[in-house]
Design a protein with these regions (language model features):
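Structural motif
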Residues: 35-37, 72, 113
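Bacterial N-terminal signal peptides
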Residues: 4-16
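A structural motif detector for short, solvent-exposed N-terminal "entry" segments of globular domains
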Residues: 20-59
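Exported/periplasmic cell-wall-interacting domains
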Residues: 20-24, 62-66, 83-222, 227-236
């Protein structure tokens, strides 16, 4: 069952199995196994949604079963930032080979690697199992379970996600549908975004009026300066 967004955004009920990279809760990736989609959420607003492919063997965190783990994870490492689209990786190293989408007979990890680590007991082996978000040349399989445990994406999509998601970003893999999240305002600065679990902070006029006497507001200083100028002009 998908846990409330307030828990996701607040990150208040998660006890990490081990802490290597600090978790960044202003950046979240939500992956729905049911929808076969990935949603990028930044500062409480939906930035993008991409089709994905999770494991053809189901869900879980079992050694040797090639399943996709569920629960809360985090981006531990990013590999391939300067590699060309379609770059083939073997043991997380660029081989020099580049594949086009739907290249016949090949199914390697390509383009980008976003390596995940588990934050809960139910996904504690994710990092050691090599669970990635990565590109695949088999783009025709995107949108249905077809991977061997990882989360596959189209090359152009995983490259875009790679550039938007920092190390430490929170990742949730859920068996439920993606939650409804409002789109992030495009024209609003990121620093002023309001998360789903927070409200805009406004200052009560009464609090402003009760400020200490030795502290002047900008408006008070402006009025004081204008009054002083008027008095000086009257003396001339």
């Amino acid at each position: 069952m998908l846990r409330p967004l307030a828990v996701l955004f607040g990150f208040i009920s998660i006890t990490p199995v081990f802490a290597l990279t600090p978790v960044n809760t202003s950046n979240q990736v939500i992956i729905s196994v049911r929808d076969q989609k990935l949603m990028l959420v930044q500062n409480g607003g939906k930035v993008a949604t991409y089709p994905v492919s999770t494991s053809m063997f189901g869900v879980g965190d079992y050694w040797g079963r090639m399943t996709t783990p569920l629960g809360y994870l985090a981006v531990e490492k990013k590999i391939g930032g300067n590699a060309p689209t379609g770059a083939v990786f073997h043991k997380r190293r660029f081989t020099g080979e580049v594949l086009q989408p739907n290249a016949p007979g090949r199914d390697p990890v390509i383009t980008r690697i976003i390596w995940l680590r588990g934050l809960e007991a139910q996904n504690a082996h994710a990092f050691q199992r090599g669970i990635y978000i990565h590109g695949t040349p088999q783009e025709k399989s995107i949108g249905r379970p077809a991977s061997y445990g990882c989360i596959r994406m189209k090359s152009t999509d995983v490259a875009a996600l790679y550039d938007r998601v920092p190390v430490g970003a929170l990742v949730q893999i859920t068996p439920e549908h993606l939650p409804k999240v409002a789109k992030a305002p495009r024209s609003q600065p990121a620093s002023t975004f309001v998360t789903a679990s927070a409200k805009p902070q406004t200052q009560d006029p009464a609090i402003s009026a009760s400020a200490s006497d030795d502290t002047l507001s900008v408006e008070q200083m402006r009025k004081g300066g204008a009054l002083a100028a008027q008095r000086a002009k009257a003396k001339l």
